[in-house]
Structure formats: C-alpha cells, structure tokens
C-alpha cells in the first residue's frame, strides 16, 4: 500500500489517490480507454515512498508494454509530455512566450540570438500551437526527446519541447530573409514541421540556430554477406558517426539457420549485427546525441516481420533496437501481390543471390522470371506469406515508430546514378 510519495522537489507528502485519478482521466480525454485499469496497474506496480514520477512512468508502461493500440500510444504520449512540461514549466505549466524562450536559451549560449522586432515576436508567438504536443504518440515523443530537441548534455534536462524545436528551426531559416518575408516564412516552415508534412534532417534539429553551425552530412554503406564486408561496414559506421554523419546502411546478410562454414555452423540472423551497428553509432556523440543510422531491409527477407518490430516500444528490451531507424524496401512485383492478395515468397540471400540483386533493378520481367524459378526450385528453402500481411505489419510500425519505406526498383529507374542504389539516408 502506498502511504507517502516523493514530489519532484524531494519533499514527502501523503499519497493522494485523486491525483493519480486526475492524471489518468486527463490523459484519457476523448480516447475512450479504461483509465481506471491503467491507474490501478500503475498503483500495483509502485511501492510506498515512490516518486510521483514513478507512478506516471508506471502508467506509461502499462500502456506501451501491455497494449499496442494507437489510443494507448496517445495516452502514454500525453503522460510523457505532461511530465516534460512539469519539469520545464512547473505544476501550473507557465509556458513562456517564443521570445522569452529564445532569450532564455540565447542568454545561456545554447542558441544564437535572433533580431526580430517586437511586432514580429508577437506575430510569431501567435503561430506556435503547444496543444499539438498532446496529439503525438509516445513513440514519437521518445524519439524526439532522445534525438531532436536541445538538451543539457551534462544533466540530460531538456531545453525545449517539440513545438519550441519546430519554431526555433523555422525562425532561424526565416531570419536570413528580408524583413517583410520573415514572419510568413516562420509560419510556413513551422506548419510543415509541426504537422509532420516535412521531416527535416536530424542535424538540422540539433544545430539550426545554435553556435555549432554544422550542416547535414550523409553517408550510405552497402554490406554483403562476408566477414571482410562486415568488418569494413562496422569500421565505416564507427568512423562516419565520429565525424557527424548520418548513415544509411544496407546489410545483405544470411537469415537464421542458414549454413555457415560448410554447414558446420548455423547462422543466427541479422539482429546481432544490427545491434553492433547501433552500439558503434552510439559510441560517438554528435552535439550530445549519438550517431544516427537507418537500416534498410526488404520484402524478400525471411526476417522481415521481426525486423519491422525491432524498434517498437512493446518489443522486449533485450531485442528492442529503439535508437535505429528502419526503412522497408519493396518493388512492383510485391505491389502486385498486395493488390491481388496473393502469397509472397520469403527467401534468404544465401539461396537466391540473383533474385536479391534483381530486386534493385527496374526490369520487372527479369525479376518475375527469377522469382518464379526460385519458387519452383524445391531444393531452395523458402516460406510463403500473404503479401498483405507483410505490408500490414510494416504500415502499422510506420504509424507507431515512424518507420520509412523505399521502392527498390523505382529508385534505380528514376535516377542519374550509374551505380546501383541500395540505401538512402533520412537526411
């Protein structure tokens, strides 16, 4: 039984169940969830003398660990950003104006001071919509708070909320224009960023308007199924991350149970290598954050459904790869299978290397011919799955964790590059 709790300021006070109820009812507004069940689950998980933030975190975990619906993600997201607002602006959420926020960060040397007129500051302040933070899912808040908003690298305390980050970037871009165009441009760019129509490069979030003055730097890396290629890829990820680059990686590796070393070893799959990429990228800090990597995987991969879920907060912690970004690749043949609601073949690159290579070619007929040959060859291990099931899994993760998509054939048809394109980068 919880009798006392510790507040944010360190003081102890009697536990007030009505406050827990208030948090749960507030987070559930217009969502229609069983907020009582969520609050009770949080209460059962915490002990006497816990912190109030522990209770909020327990409610978040009750949503994202045990449930995967959009409503639960929104419920948890509201609790998360509510906690951020409490830490930044106090119990009454005394949110500063855009000018007050900017001047505060400029005084600390976090951002470069911008020189708008008082009238412009008032107009800009009318643009920002803080309520949009309450409409973001938990997975979005976690990603933004870890990667994109400015923070004190020593204490970990955030300097800004998502909406303040969007307006900061918009103001910096607009400050380079003529006075008469500045406020209009702030509004246009803020709307694009805040409504998620435009996804800006990660370095922009971190550097725009700050003394760092860095610009995006992007690298793509191709890894094939050999020890030498793996070694070179891992070294490249480490070196590029140390130099501030965002990295797009395509790993064409064997799948679980594929033979290794003349059938003396069974392959363990891609997870360990993805985890190594993640660790090497995070080993080097870029303005307080780790390096950023986007893993590209395809519709042919036997692990496709598992890979799609590795970023999700509901995935077990020992498997979860929360700090990597993922992009799903497919071609016209896969789209046909989705449209026709037919089966789709999953096969390892070890058994069908030519098919995997043709996935990146614009010639649809060549791919289909090789696809049918591999499918008919009974000596090649494979499995058939409904194409719509694969796409459904990927699209669900796109909504929950901002997963991306690319079209392997189209990006090699509509291109000025002579070399085959295997991956891109979020920048």
What are these regions (language model features)?
Residues 1-427:
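Extended catalytic cores of very large enzyme megasubunits
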